[in-house]
Amino acid sequence: MPELPEVEVTRRGLLPHVVGRRIAAVTVRHRGLRWPVDPGLEACLAHRLVRRIERRGKYLLLECISADAAQPPGWLLVHLGMTGTLRVLPEAPPPGMHDHFDLLLDAGPAPGMLADTIVLRFRDPRRFGAILWTTLPEAELASHPLLSTLGIEPFDPAFDGAWLHRHTRGRSAAIKTVLLSGAIVVGVGNIYASESLFRAGIRPTTAAGRLSRARCDRLAQAVRDTLAQAIERGGSTLRDFVGSDGASGYFQLDCFVYDRAGLPCRVCATPVRQIVQGQRSTFYCPKCQH
């Protein structure tokens, strides 16, 4: 499943090719995604300009503005689900059975575009992704039902050990489970939770509320470092994920513990252990993490 690093890699890959372009045509082939695609989406998007691409948690937010001042700006919310990708294509090749959505983008008023038209194509074999439209003002966007429950961004300066310590008090759930929930901090998926906890030296089964301030300091830093490294490496490709240019990610090659059950810890050579938490595989070193 694409997590924060994969979504951020996608966002950064789209920026130079998509921002400033005008939506010339919209093609929706399959509306039955995680939530049905709005039947009026084509009309909402037609002839709008893509002004910005932001990210909130695992959602991509494309701000689309109209030349008609009477039309408010809107936001196209895209979630990649478990197997989704957004690709920039120089032309529109014949769609495959899992290619559900295309935006044909022309150069619009933006100078210096390398191609007159490109296609932004959404592919999702399992159809757990989502494409939604909202005209909520930017100041109210955080109140959208899909965004309102999300925790703080891990790269927000406010996210630090003090924040983590304060928001884990009284929580008896395991710290890995708390990280995965996204309620305190967003984007720490299964791979990145295991890796962050290893770097912080914290056993994933430790009750979140028992972490000292010092351990929360280490964990907050480990979360930021792990996610930053994953973004730099293009994310993790375990099965389906590719970036907007079709390139695979390579962070999985750097993992200390994830998917290394029985192999020697890269630090102390103790065999890595695997357990199940909340129906998800967890990997840790019994010597380095306590």
From Swiss-Prot:
Keywords: DNA damage, DNA repair, DNA-binding, Glycosidase, Hydrolase, Lyase, Metal-binding, Multifunctional enzyme, Zinc, Zinc-finger. Monomer. It catalyses: Hydrolysis of DNA containing ring-opened 7-methylguanine residues, releasing 2,6-diamino-4-hydroxy-5-(N-methyl)formamidopyrimidine; 2'-deoxyribonucleotide-(2'-deoxyribose 5'-phosphate)-2'-deoxyribonucleotide-DNA = a 3'-end 2'-deoxyribonucleotide-(2,3-dehydro-2,3-deoxyribose 5'-phosphate)-DNA + a 5'-end 5'-phospho-2'-deoxyribonucleoside-DNA + H(+). The lineage of its organism: Bacteria, Pseudomonadati, Pseudomonadota, Betaproteobacteria, Burkholderiales. Its EC number is 3.2.2.23, 4.2.99.18. A zinc finger (FPG-type) spans 256-290. InterPro entries: DNA_glyclase/AP_lyase_DNA-bd, DNA_glyclase_Znf_dom_DNA_BS, Formamido-pyr_DNA_Glyclase, FPG_cat, MutM-like_N-ter, Ribosomal_uS13-like_H2TH, Znf_DNA_glyclase/AP_lyase, Znf_FPG/IleRS. It comes from the Bacteria. The active site is at 2 (schiff-base intermediate with dna), 3 (proton donor), 58 (proton donor), 280 (proton donor). Binds 1 zinc ion per subunit. PROSITE patterns: FPG_CAT, ZF_FPG_1, ZF_FPG_2. Belongs to the FPG family. One of its GO terms (biological process) is base-excision repair. One of its GO terms (molecular function) is zinc ion binding. Its cofactor is Zn(2+). This is Formamidopyrimidine-DNA glycosylase. DNA binds at residues 98, 126, 171. Involved in base excision repair of DNA damaged by oxidation or by mutagenic agents. Acts as a DNA glycosylase that recognizes and removes damaged bases. Has a preference for oxidized purines, such as 7,8-dihydro-8-oxoguanine (8-oxoG). Has AP (apurinic/apyrimidinic) lyase activity and introduces nicks in the DNA strand. Cleaves the DNA backbone by beta-delta elimination to generate a single-strand break at the site of the removed base with both 3'- and 5'-phosphates.
